Amino acid sequence: MEKFELIAPCHFGLEAVMKREILDLGYEITAVEDGKVTFEGDAEAIAYANVFLRTTERILLKVGQFRAETFEELFEKTRALPWERYIPKDGKFWVTKANSVKSRLFSPSDIQSIMKKAMVERLKTVYHIQWFEETGSSFPIRVSILKDVVTVGLDTSGVSLHKRGYRKLTAKAPITETLAAALLMLTPWKKDRILVDPFCGSGTFPIEAAMMAAQIAPGMNRSFLAEQWKHLVPRKHWYDVMDDAASRVDLTVETDIQGFDIDGDVIRSARENARLAQVDHLIHFQQRPVSELSHPRKYGFLVTNPPYGERLEEKEALPELYRVLGERFRALDSWSMYLITSYEDAQRYIGKKADKNRKIYNGMLRTYFYQYAGPKPPKKRTGE
């Protein structure tokens, strides 16, 4: 079966999580770089990666990689790529995004235009036609240039994979589903342990945790661009992968996941999002301020995305908010806490230095993932 190189972009700082997910699917990693993991897989792997990977933004099919320091080089080397292997005669194709870092070629619009012309020239020669109707399936191309090395990939996903199909209602400053899933994977939380988000917003952390607990694949309720590419990914692969995903779901799983927020409207949005994700029965949402945070059980997890204070009036309220969060966390003496924030004084007002502090870029925003590890619960005796 034909093999492809596939690229899974991810948040900077979370490449190890992405790598682990891909290995768990059984694919061979060929490269790990800042913000992306490359692996080898067949046509079925394109379907599996899109449906099952929780932490990537999209899956790119690598068309080629080359060095280019001039637009002439870019044109010639783009034209030399085997575009006919991927794009049929009636295909609609364009460079949807180009980014350049530390490279001589830096104008995205020029890069896009020149590469499209080169692709057209190649396909005109191969297909013996002068004009492309482009009435068939879509083939968007994404290009990244780093230190003059051009990487070219076909976007197999279409709409970003963080869009699972359940978030219809959004709270202010939401965390993306892919980032929330990756952060949950950085914690030792398992489905038999308590998880509480005291600033749950539209419910992303609780919903992603519940989907993991119920083994609901993140791409089960959406479509993908490569479903149109029958010559590359036969329809049978998509049916088989979706059947596999459906067979793993366990909606009867027992788990204790809770989400609190001071805003009642936000809680209603979170409940609706959970319903659309088919996990509303697994999560308890409640309107509650962080000052009332408590739980009768031990050895739980707080996983949260507190307010960052992007506006001045919000920033002035942050010291007290983080002080109260730290106070309530200390009252939960056997618990662990994991929070992502861009607020640099978070540890100071929480009143305790984190055991680990990981820098993560949420888009262009530099954030910190503070990790406070609590004690492990005692092991159950045999026969209990």
Spell out what each predicted region is.
Residues 2-137:
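Non-catalytic nucleic-acid substrate-recognition regions in nucleic-acid-modifying enzymes
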Residues 96-98, 144-186:
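Class I S-adenosyl-L-methionine
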Residues 100-103, 160, 307-311:
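A short, flexible beta-alpha/helix-coil linker loop
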Residues 289-384:
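C-terminal catalytic and target-recognition region of SAM-dependent MTase-like enzymes
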